[in-house]
Amino acid sequence: MGVTGILQLPRDRFKRTSFFLWVIILFQRTFSIPLGVIHNSTLQVNDVDKLVCRDKLSSTNQLRSVGLNLEGNGVATDVPSATKRWGFRSGVPPKVVNYEAGEWAENCYNLEIKKPDGSECLPAAPDGIRGFPRCRYVHKVSGTGPCAGDFAFHKEGAFFLYDRLASTVIYRGTTFAEGVVAFLILPQAKKDFFSSHPLREPVNATEDPSSGYYSTTIRYQATGFGTNETEYLFEVDNLTYVQLESRFTPQFLLQLNETIYTSGKRSNTTGKLIWKVNPEIDTTIGEWAFWETKKTSLEKFAVKSCLSQLYQTEPKTSVVRVRRELLPTQGPTQQLKTTKSWLQKIPLQWFKCTVKEGKLQCRI
């Protein structure tokens, strides 16, 4: 996984851990949980010894749970790549935990998969589980597959993040982002640390600019979902499709969709029309603001906790998230009043592109 933590608790150590560590490990035995302290609006790794081993953690009110999206670590987010990280399995009960705050996601997913006999592959979402509330692009995949198992799990042990709830399984027709859940340790209990309240409008009703962000749904058709021979089609309309490739970015697909409409390339019969993109066409168009906001730096650091000698003997490589400062002439998209923390909205800016002589020409 992309997130490397600083503390691991093997199964045979469970009975000897304190209540604090037991709370941390609730999330999953195999996880490495990053621990940190908020100082001056940044997430910094701090000496766990100062808080735990010297009894400075006075109550669980000093813990704040956050959802961290995998895409911030640079994992491939295109549909063919992302779906390979998920797999069906039986005999393992699903688990759900809550988290208090999260990031804005660039890519989310929504699955409606059926078996060849027409039965559903994925369970319906339990009461109270709603879709991830902040997605720039929602990749909605419909189709069929063998679905050899009761539930779809994450092969790398990550969670599927929903609206302030994280589950180990995928629910039918419910938008999710891939991620992990981690605790932040505050120097002292702060009631107003996360002061902003999430908006409650559904993801598909955000075209009003006053809502503060845009969400676009991109639709796909899948056959053989969950197998090595899965085929994906990008849906332009119910009769016009494009063969999907991993190199296609969401921005390229939207540009391609507009090009097919404006150039009259849609199916004009009752039959299905499937296009294939010329391999020479540049598909690397993307939103620079997203990756600027998600910049990460790799640093070496050693755990100095009194527990470190039990569980870790050498420094680990960890991902430290750094918030990008806007230039004085720049401003973020309209947003709700919030604390000055590293959990911020993604300033959305995008390219405008035209197709001339078979080549994409883009400008900001």
Curated annotation (Swiss-Prot):
Keywords, comma-separated and alphabetical: Cleavage on pair of basic residues, Disulfide bond, Glycoprotein, Ion channel, Ion transport, Secreted, Signal, Transport, Viral ion channel
Superkingdom, taxonomy of origin: Viruses
Glycosylation sites: N40, N204, N228, N238, N257, N268
Keyword Transferase recorded: no
InterPro entries found in the cross-reference section: GPC_FiloV, GPC_filovir-type_extra_dom
GO biological process: monoatomic ion transmembrane transport
Molecular function GO terms recorded: channel activity
Signal peptide bounds: 1-32
Record family assignment: Belongs to the filoviruses glycoprotein family.
Protein name, as recorded: Pre-small/secreted glycoprotein
Organism this protein belongs to: Zaire ebolavirus (strain Eckron-76) (ZEBOV)
